[in-house]
């Protein structure tokens, strides 16, 4: 279908353009397009924009800038893809320590800001629109809208990681001093991104499904609600902690404006009445099905996605996760945050007793059914060639390093359990990459309302989250019933409206690669990361300790040669699995709250490329 067509167009385009460069704020795309007058037709505009729809297979690295959309995939230990990126948060843990959470990021690890290359290419197109002889046509408007969307996207991705940037909206003349520009304040960059998204909404066409797999008005609105919510919460919570990461010029009125923009953009999507939470009435499977279905074009929840065919365009999700391993595991922190089936926090003796028989704590008769559709329960089939009794206990020792589970909780979400393609070959899986779904709209809307006025907006928040609850048969939101004030709960001091919405976001979006962004924008590392260390399932004190599947293969509490690590010490009645050797991390993660909320800028960017106009991020 369209996959091969787009792939061939892209390969030809790259050969013509010769896209190269480091940051390239000041260069035009090299070579020629298909004519001597660039973008003379809408066909040429479309072909040019196809490059921004690409995501790696990074073994086919034909572009010299970041992805224009979120890529699906998996590397042993997680990686940066949708299915694995939560290993850089408190949701999942890997066989390797997250350098950022551990406070071990170094200045020498700073990378090129390659998204400026994509921005330069988009600026080149936007500055040559007058060449098009089809100006004003529906196709012309669509592709202009796509260009504005992608420019906003590339700036936003850098903004998340680096904060203040230089806003460049023209291909700069390398002989002019104007390329030597300082970093603008955060709010200027955020406002510029939002302005580009307003233009994208104005130009893009309206679609009622995701069949074209191209951007449309509601996708731009979805990103606008995300950007506005991101910056509103970033400024609010970093300002409240009086750290070095907020815009010192920002006012409370400005912060409220961001929340209002997030509400308005989400409401525009909601008011169309086109999109809906995917719900066939199967409370135990509808949620999971969405993340493993190859073709989502008919799914009413999915605004935009990237389809993988498992052949020309594939990923490694199944390869690494369809035996319960992947050198990762879901954390107890995430598992414990799901409510009970009657809508109460899962705490105290009830939690401990359930964990004494592995899998009982996951049962949909006890817990929110989204949990058993995210984490493997005993009896869960993971591959079409599996033979009963299927998944019995987690593979704490795998048949290979990448088939080992690190916490005792195996990730089920994203695994195509009935996949008919190659199960174990590299880049032969077809797990889809969902970019935006209607749940994102509802969650953004609810969170922004809670930030504006939880009390006054309580019923609107309940109504917005109701479809998410209905899909899995959970009771409606009750802010008092769900309020968790346990001493070990990181958000126990938040007001109940914000706490409930944040939990709902964590649960609904679990293991979709977005948790770290949330922690950073909430300035919540000191509550959730600093001094913490990930743990998993209960081992000592549960039936896992002497399970016959393991026999004598598990080695722990020895001076050397251990292949399993546990909390506590020998003789403790309850000991939990931890993913890595804790030696050197006895005091937990050492995330530096005065430095690690933003990544370091590469030295070359501070000197040669900006003439010394850029300054380094705080703490670096």
Language-model features and meaning:
Residues 1-20:
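Sec-dependent bacterial lipoprotein signal peptides
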Residues 121, 189, 196, 240, ...:
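Alpha-helical solenoid repeat scaffolds, predominantly canonical TPR units
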Residues 36, 63-83, 168-170, 205-222, ...:
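Short, surface-exposed recognition loops and adjoining beta-strand edges that mediate ligand/DNA contacts
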Residues 439-445, 455-485:
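Active/binding-pocket-proximal capping segment
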Residues 159-166, 208, 230-239, 451-455:
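Short coil/turn linking the two alpha-helices of tandem helical-hairpin repeats
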Residues 22, 115-118, 192, 283-340, ...:
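Long, intrinsically disordered, low-complexity segments
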Residues 46-59, 84-162, 176-191, 195-212, ...:
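Conserved, well-structured interaction surfaces
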Residues 22-70, 354-356, 365, 602-620:
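Membrane-proximal, proline-rich intrinsically disordered regions
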């Amino acid at each position: 279908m369209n996959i091969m067509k787009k792939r061939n167009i892209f390969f030809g385009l790259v050969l013509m353009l010769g896209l190269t460069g480091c940051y390239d704020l000041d260069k035009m795309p090299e070579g020629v397009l298909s004519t001597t007058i660039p973008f003379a037709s809408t066909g040429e505009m479309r072909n040019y924009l196809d490059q921004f729809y690409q995501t790696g297979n990074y073994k086919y690295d034909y572009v010299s800038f970041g992805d224009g959309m979120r890529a699906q995939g998996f590397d042993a230990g997680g990686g940066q893809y949708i299915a694995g990126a939560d290993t850089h948060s408190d949701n999942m843990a890997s066989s390797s320590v997250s350098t950022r959470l551990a406070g071990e990021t170094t200045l020498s690890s700073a990378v090129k800001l390659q998204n400026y290359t994509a921005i330069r290419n988009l600026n080149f197109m936007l500055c040559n629109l007058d060449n098009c002889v089809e100006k004003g046509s529906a196709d012309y408007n669509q592709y202009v809208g796509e260009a504005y969307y992608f420019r906003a996207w590339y700036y936003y991705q850098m903004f998340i990681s680096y904060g203040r940037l230089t806003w460049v909206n023209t291909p700069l003349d390398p002989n002019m001093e104007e390329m030597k520009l300082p970093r603008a304040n955060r709010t200027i960059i955020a406002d510029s991104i939002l302005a580009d998204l307003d233009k994208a909404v104005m130009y893009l066409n309206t679609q009622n499904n995701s069949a074209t797999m191209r951007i449309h008005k509601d996708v731009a609105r979805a990103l606008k609600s995300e950007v506005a919510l991101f910056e509103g919460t970033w400024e609010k919570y970093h300002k409240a902690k009086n750290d070095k990461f907020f815009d010192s010029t920002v006012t409370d009125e400005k912060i409220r404006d961001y929340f209002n923009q997030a509400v308005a953009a989400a409401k525009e999507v909601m008011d169309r009445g086109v999109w809906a939470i995917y719900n066939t009435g199967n409370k135990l499977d509808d949620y999971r099905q969405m993340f493993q279905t190859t073709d989502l074009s008919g799914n009413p929840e999915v605004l935009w996605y990237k389809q993988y065919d498992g052949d020309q365009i594939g990923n490694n999700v199944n390869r690494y996760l369809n035996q319960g391993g992947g050198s990762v595991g879901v954390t107890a922190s995430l598992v414990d945050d799901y409510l009970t089936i009657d809508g109460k926090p899962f705490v105290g003796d009830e939690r401990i007793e359930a964990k004494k028989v592995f899998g009982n704590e996951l049962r949909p008769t006890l817990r929110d059914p989204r949990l058993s559709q995210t984490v493997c329960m005993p009896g869960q089939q993971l591959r079409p060639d599996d033979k009963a009794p299927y998944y019995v206990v987690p593979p704490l020792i795998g048949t290979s390093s990448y088939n080992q589970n690190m916490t005792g909780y195996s990730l089920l979400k994203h695994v195509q359990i009935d996949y008919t393609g190659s199960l174990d070959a590299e880049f032969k899986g077809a797990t889809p990459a969902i970019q935006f779904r209607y749940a994102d709209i509802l969650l953004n809307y609810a969170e922004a309302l809670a930030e504006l006025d939880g009390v006054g907006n309580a019923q609107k928040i309940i109504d917005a989250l109701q479809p998410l609850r209905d899909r899995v048969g959970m009771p409606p939101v009750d802010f008092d019933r769900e309020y968790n004030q346990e001493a070990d709960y990181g958000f126990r001091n938040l007001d109940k409206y914000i706490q409930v919405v944040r939990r709902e976001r964590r649960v609904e979006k679990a293991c979709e690669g977005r948790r770290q962004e949330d922690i950073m924008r909430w300035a919540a590392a000191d509550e959730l990361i600093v001094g913490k260390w990930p743990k998993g399932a209960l081992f000592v004190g549960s039936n896992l300790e002497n399970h016959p599947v393991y026999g004598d293969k598990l080695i722990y509490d020895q001076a050397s040669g251990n292949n399993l690590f546990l909390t506590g010490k020998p003789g403790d009645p309850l000991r939990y699995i931890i993913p890595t050797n804790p030696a050197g991390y006895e005091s937990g993660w050492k995330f530096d709250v005065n430095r690690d909320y933003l990544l370091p800028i590469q030295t070359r960017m501070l000197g040669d490329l900006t003439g010394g106009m850029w300054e380094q991020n705080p703490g670096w």
